[in-house]
């Protein structure tokens, strides 16, 4: 099994789309608050402090768009950002953070699971993995949930500037995908060096509805 490789072209690299300014449009702390924008949605999910909000800020060229904190568990609701009325970017709460009450963790779990299972407009899920930590059990559970609900996803290794050799990560991803019998993009991104930002934008731009 091989991962797909995105080769951005002038028409698909996402530069035109991400030239527009994204804006925060809604936050949902429970399932009843989840909005329906009737636009394609792409979601970012991963462990707490994996860099979801920072990555959204990087690809949108706005360091103040999604709130960023060095404290794990800061994102406590689903945040929705509108990009040019063409795409909704969804920042999900992180999972696996221990230093919150069990009731809060359960609430986040219900919220994340419900959104991933039920969002009608969800087109692509970006499963973020910390390059320094590798794929953990919680990540595998999320991947299982996505496959069970026929959700398309791609693996994004964050903080790639913190590791010197991507081969071990590549092999780990390949073995993981083989166990799932699934093939998808595997990317390496760094908010500091901007590595992988162009390829990621290209994959997201493909989720836009075609012009009629």
Swiss-Prot record:
It comes from the Bacteria. PROSITE patterns: G_ENGB (PS51706). Mg(2+) binds at residues 53, 75. Necessary for normal cell division and for the maintenance of normal septation. Belongs to the TRAFAC class TrmE-Era-EngA-EngB-Septin-like GTPase superfamily. EngB GTPase family. One of its GO terms (molecular function) is metal ion binding. Coiled coil: none annotated. The keyword ATP-binding does not apply. GTP binds at residues 46-53, 73-77, 91-94, 158-161, 189-191. It comes from Rickettsia africae (strain ESF-5). Keywords: Cell cycle, Cell division, GTP-binding, Magnesium, Metal-binding, Nucleotide-binding, Septation. Its cofactor is Mg(2+). The keyword Ribosomal protein does not apply. GO terms for biological process: division septum assembly. Residues 38-210 form the EngB-type G domain. This is Probable GTP-binding protein EngB. The lineage of its organism: Bacteria, Pseudomonadati, Pseudomonadota, Alphaproteobacteria, Rickettsiales. InterPro entries: G_ENGB_dom (IPR030393), GTP-bd (IPR006073), GTP-bd_ribosome_bio_YsxC (IPR019987), P-loop_NTPase (IPR027417).
């Amino acid at each position: 099994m091989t991962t797909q490789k995105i080769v951005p072209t002038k028409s698909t690299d996402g530069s035109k789309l991400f030239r527009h300014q994204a804006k925060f449009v809604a936050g949902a702390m429970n399932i009843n608050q989840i909005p329906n924008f009737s636009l394609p949605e792409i979601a970012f999910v991963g462990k707490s402090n994996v860099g979801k909000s920072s990555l959204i800020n990087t690809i949108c060229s706005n360091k103040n768009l999604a709130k960023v904190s060095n404290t794990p568990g800061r994102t406590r609701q689903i945040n929705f950002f509108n990009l040019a009325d063409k795409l909704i970017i969804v920042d999900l709460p992180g999972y696996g953070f221990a230093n919150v009450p069990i009731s809060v963790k359960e609430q986040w779990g219900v919220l994340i699971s419900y959104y991933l299972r039920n969002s009608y407009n969800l087109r692509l899920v970006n499963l973020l993995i910390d390059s320094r930590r590798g794929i953990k059990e919680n990540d595998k559970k999320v991947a299982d949930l996505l496959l069970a609900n026929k959700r398309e996803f791609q693996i994004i290794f964050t903080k790639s500037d913190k590791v010197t050799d991507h081969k071990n990560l590549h092999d780990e991803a390949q073995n993981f995908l083989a166990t799932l019998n699934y093939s998808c993009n595997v990317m390496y991104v760094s908010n500091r060096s901007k590595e992988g930002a162009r390829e990621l934008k290209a994959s997201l731009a493909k989720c836009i509805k075609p012009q009629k």
